[in-house]
Amino acid sequence: MPVEVIPVLHNVSSVQRVVDMARLSYSLGLDTLVVTKAYGGAAQSGVPEAMRLALKLGKSLVVLPELRDAVNLLSPTHVLAVTPSRAERLVGPGGLEGLEGRVLVVFSGGEPELDPSEAAGAIRVYIEGVEGKVGPIAEAALILYFLLRGGGDGRG
């Protein structure tokens, strides 16, 4: 079964972070980006700018109030939560073994990691060979690239 990777940017207030995540996701060939719990500038300016980019490229942007809404509505086979300090598995150039179906990859849009309650039930992952938090866009670039190139075509 092929893997469909869908990035999720959760709990974000930065306009630039939303736009950068959209550019990154779409440039990797992904069709869908999900933004959950956007507030402040991200909600007022970042989401509209990312929507403009999505429409221009023929891609999708899904904006939802909570992470659980994305999980409930998109019915993923797996949820990966990017958590540098509590990772159970590491994602490297070979991707991540055992993934199939629809995979949501959740990146924290703010400085704190995902709250343990938000990551409940998810596979907690981080980047092989990287020590410490490098920020959500760098994390997304590496993890999404490894997942897409390491284990078949994961374009969503």
UniProtKB/Swiss-Prot annotation:
Residues spanning the membrane: none
GO molecular function: DNA binding; endonuclease activity
InterPro entries: DUF2122_RecB-nuclease-rel
Pfam family membership, one: DUF2122
Domain of life: Archaea
EC number of this enzyme: 3.1.21.4
Function according to Swiss-Prot or TrEMBL: A putative type II restriction enzyme, its methylase would be APE_2002.
Family stated for the protein in its record: To M.jannaschii MJ1199.
Record-given protein name: Putative type II restriction enzyme ApeKORF2002P
Organism per entry: Aeropyrum pernix (strain ATCC 700893 / DSM 11879 / JCM 9820 / NBRC 100138 / K1)
Lineage per the UniProt record: Archaea, Thermoproteota, Thermoprotei, Desulfurococcales, Desulfurococcaceae
